[in-house]
C-alpha cells in the first residue's frame, strides 16, 4: 500500500498507521488495539443491565476487525449471564462498506431486535451507529426501555439529551492517546517500536486494557453500580486469567 511505498522513499522519517499491522518496516509504527477486551467489559455491563436477557450486537461490515468487537462482547455477556443470548447482525457484508454510513438500515435492524425483546444494543458501525440511538429514543417514546452502547469515543458526550437517557456506556478506543504517544516519542527522538510480529518484522504498539488503550466509559453514571464486576473482569483479563477471543465462536 501507499505507506509501504512512502516509508521506503523516506527511510529517515517515522510513520504511524492505525488499525493495521501489515507494514514491515522499522520506520512504520503500527498502532493496533485489543477491541475485544474493551468489548468484553461492555458485554459484562450489557448482561448486568439487561432485564430480558436478550442483547444485540450490530457491526457495520462483517470484517475481521469488527468481528473482534463481536467476539469480545459475546464472551463478556456469556461469562456474566450464561442464559443471555446475543443477536448478532451486520449492516452490510464485505466488500460492501456502505454499512459504516447507513443509519437508516441500522435503525431497521435495531427495531427488529427490539421487537424480539432485545433491550441492550451495542453498535460498532461508524456513522451508522446513529440509527441505533434513534431506534432506542423512539422505543423510549413508545414506553419501551432499550439501552444502547456506543463505540470508539465516549459517545454520551456528543449524544442528544434524549439519547443520553438510554446510553448505557461506550467501548472507548483511545486512538488519541496512541497517536499522541507516537508523536511525543518522535519529538523526543524516540520511536514506538515494540515487536508486534518478529517473524514478519512488524513494529509498533498494542493498546489494550493494560495501558489504557481500550475500556468502558462511565458518563451518565448508569454503570457505576456494576463497576466492581467490570473491574474484576478487567483485572482477570490483564493477568491473563481470562483470555478474550478475537474471533467469533472461539
Segments and roles (model prediction):
Residues 1-250:
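A residue-level marker of the well-folded mature domains of exported/periplasmic proteins
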Amino acid at each position: 500500500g501507499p505507506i509501504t511505498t512512502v516509508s521506503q522513499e523516506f527511510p529517515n522519517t517515522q510513520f504511524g498507521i492505525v488499525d493495521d499491522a501489515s507494514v514491515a518496516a522499522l520506520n512504520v509504527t503500527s498502532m493496533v488495539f485489543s477491541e475485544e477486551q474493551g468489548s468484553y467489559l461492555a458485554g459484562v455491563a450489557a448482561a448486568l443491565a439487561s432485564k430480558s436477557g436478550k442483547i444485540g450486537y450490530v457491526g457495520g461490515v462483517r470484517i475481521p476487525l469488527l468481528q473482534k468487537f463481536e467476539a469480545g462482547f459475546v464472551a463478556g455477556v456469556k461469562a456474566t449471564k450464561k442464559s443471555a443470548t446475543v443477536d448478532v447482525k451486520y449492516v452490510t457484508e464485505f466488500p460492501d462498506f456502505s454499512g459504516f454510513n447507513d443509519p437508516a438500515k441500522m435503525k431497521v435492524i435495531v427495531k427488529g431486535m427490539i421487537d424480539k425483546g432485545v433491550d441492550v444494543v451495542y453498535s460498532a458501525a461508524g456513522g451508522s451507529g446513529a440509527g441505533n440511538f434513534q431506534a432506542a429514543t423512539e422505543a423510549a417514546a413508545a414506553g419501551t426501555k432499550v439501552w444502547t452502547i456506543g463505540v470508539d469515543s465516549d459517545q454520551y458526550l456528543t449524544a442528544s439529551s434524549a439519547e443520553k437517557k438510554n446510553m448505557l456506556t461506550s467501548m472507548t478506543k483511545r486512538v488519541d492517546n496512541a497517536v499522541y504517544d507516537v508523536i511525543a516519542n518522535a519529538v523526543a527522538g524516540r520511536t514506538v517500536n515494540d515487536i508486534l510480529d518478529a517473524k514478519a518484522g512488524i513494529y509498533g504498539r498494542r493498546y489494550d486494557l493494560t495501558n489504557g488503550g481500550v475500556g468502558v466509559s462511565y458518563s451518565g453514571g448508569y454503570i457505576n453500580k456494576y463497576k466492581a464486576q467490570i473491574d474484576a473482569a478487567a483485572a482477570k483479563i490483564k493477568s491473563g486469567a481470562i483470555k478474550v477471543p478475537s474471533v467469533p465462536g472461539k
